């Protein structure tokens, strides 16, 4: 396993304040964790001129030009997704800064700094798949659902076992989401949402599940979501698939129950190649791919913790065999041994054998395809 921890310079261990780069969703999700450890935010840098001059949680938002003479020796944590991080990283390096010495990504900060400075085992983003059934058959599905040899719903007991195993071994998960297939197809959805909300809500920043909007959840599920502040992320494929009426009905229901939600339409997808045309890479090409991709989402399935949730799905589909180093059997980790539990965090920043054949989500994958194209 290629470990990507232990990259931050020694000075990071002594800090009690940071500068955030980005006043968006990621900062909002992380704010409770920052409060837990009493780390101070000096100010927030943001390129969006409409945010500059305003505040985030009472903290000033300023431009980089206004910030550069105030940074001094303070460390910057970039609060964005991977693609935007690369762009900001280049910008800061062009201005004389050094990655891991002067700044780092939020995922790196969560996994490395919280362990070194606070002794906490924290994860950034974990997905748990609750069903491999779906209402659509997307040719380029990034979970490979149409290519499964056998599809099924996970039972409540299986899902409960997963979350109990993981949450008893880590202190905090910034973003925890339930996926499919189409999660609404699983009759256990309401029960597992309520169980996680009741038992572990204080241990995760954002609790969410992801749907395609083709099925409207029951009122009972909406009430559970409202009670536990559960976020719904809706993937909009209506430009390719005719179901806009269902999407609009779902939107109306979400507004009626005042549910936190995002309805997202992607204009383009990148084809992973697998399983119909898996990528072939030599060692040098693989290293470049890992530099470009480096997904933030880990997987929690079948009582195991996976570096990449997509790699789990590749194996579950019946078309790939993972190496033993690609996952951790959680039952084998002593929940009372914090050093042993830290192996989970180490794997979260690692790699896996599936990377050799997966096109991935990085800038090196330019094999673009239409969104939601059906088989």
Where are these regions (language model features)?
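Generic structural signal for small/hydrophobic residues in well-ordered secondary structure
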Residues: 76-78, 130, 134, 303
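N-terminal pre-core extensions flanking Radical SAM catalytic domains
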Residues: 97-150, 327, 331-375
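Hydrophobic, well-ordered beta-alpha structural blocks that scaffold small-molecule cofactor pockets
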Residues: 1-117
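Conserved AdoMet/S-adenosylmethionine-binding subsite of the radical SAM
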Residues: 186-302, 306-311, 316
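Short hydrophobic segments within beta-strands
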Residues: 20-21, 45, 79, 129, ...
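Hydrophobic/aromatic residues located in beta-strands of well-ordered beta-sheets
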Residues: 18, 76-78, 176, 207-209, ...
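Conserved alpha-helical substructure of the radical SAM core
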Residues: 109-211, 216-219
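Accessory C-terminal segments flanking Radical SAM cores
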Residues: 26, 276-375
